[in-house]
């Protein structure tokens, strides 16, 4: 996740000796005497916000962040609360399940919880990182038409193979948000915005009247110059989304299972090569997720 890269490169200050990586999946090796939810041998995956079990976001529910304010998953063994994990989706490998707690849940909350996405809706996803790819997969499983953007024609072909209905190369089309409006007859119902400052105005332009924009990233900068009147004249809903609760994760797991969704893994590294994995992530050449195996 981009969050993990920020922890690794000092972009997010953490305590000395903090174990990184917000997401992980594995098998329970032992349980304490008071544990009732799990038993030895259960296959589980982590929660990004272990204290956010259900309900709406509140500050006290998101102070504990795995791999940030508390130790993360880049280790052979971890001792955690029974509420700090959920079950894994059936049919996935540990590596595939480990891609979901941050990127998958962010996409799920944006589209299904906040966005109330339905079959027949349309969605714009930006780029080929983890959130955008799983959002594309969740949307197609739900019967949604998807427009995807990329700066690479080769990646564009891979997006089409995953089910994208339209692909736009924004490196070749400076007015790509106008192109989105043209091919969707007025704009999309939902936008997953990962670029922040660099893409927000494009997202506003690409959304249809009464459309929804989920701000989930800042890859293009933390500040944006936007046409504010366009937001209220189009009566857009613009909201920030940061991962989600345990209850949301359980719902996402059921959707992954019913849709037979297989997360896209670009590369897998041994834990000992974590620095190499981060360097590859920073190069922005990946398609989907990068995982570590132990």
Question: Residue spans of the language-model regions?
Answer:
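NAD(P)H dinucleotide-binding glycine-rich loop of Rossmann-like/cofactor-binding domains
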Residues: 48-126
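Adenosine-nucleotide cofactor-binding segment
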Residues: 122-128, 140-202
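Rossmann-fold dehydrogenase core element
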Residues: 209-216, 225-267
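C-terminal hydrophobic helical "lid"/dimerization subdomain
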Residues: 201, 246-294
């Amino acid at each position: 996740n981009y969050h993990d890269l920020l922890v690794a490169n000092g972009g997010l200050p953490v305590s000395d000796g903090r174990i990184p990586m917000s997401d992980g999946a594995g098998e329970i090796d032992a349980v304490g005497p008071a544990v009732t939810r799990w038993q030895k041998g259960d296959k589980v995956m982590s929660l990004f916000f272990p204290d956010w079990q259900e309900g709406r976001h509140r500050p006290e529910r998101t102070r504990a962040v795995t791999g940030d304010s508390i130790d993360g998953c880049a280790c052979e063994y971890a001792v955690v609360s029974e509420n700090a994990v959920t079950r894994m989706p059936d049919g996935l490998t540990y590596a595939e399940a480990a891609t979901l707690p941050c990127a998958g849940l962010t996409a799920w909350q944006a589209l299904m919880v906040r966005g109330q996405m339905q079959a027949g809706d349309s969605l714009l996803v930006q780029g080929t990182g983890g959130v955008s790819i799983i959002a594309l997969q969740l949307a197609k499983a739900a019967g949604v038409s998807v427009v995807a953007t990329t700066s690479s024609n080769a990646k564009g072909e891979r997006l089409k193979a995953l089910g994208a209905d339209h692909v736009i190369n924004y490196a070749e089309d400076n007015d790509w948000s106008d192109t989105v409006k043209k091919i969707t007859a007025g704009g999309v119902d939902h936008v997953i915005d990962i670029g922040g400052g660099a893409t927000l105005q494009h997202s506003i332009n690409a959304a249809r009247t009464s459309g929804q924009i989920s701000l989930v990233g800042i890859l293009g900068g933390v500040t944006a110059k936007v046409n504010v009147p366009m937001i209220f004249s189009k009566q857009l809903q613009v909201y920030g989304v940061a991962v989600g609760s345990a209850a949301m994760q359980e719902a996402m797991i059921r959707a992954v299972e019913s849709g037979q969704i297989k997360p896209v893994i670009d590369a897998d590294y041994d834990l000992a090569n974590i620095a190499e994995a981060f360097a590859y992530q920073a190069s922005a050449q990946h398609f989907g997720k990068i995982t570590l195996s132990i």
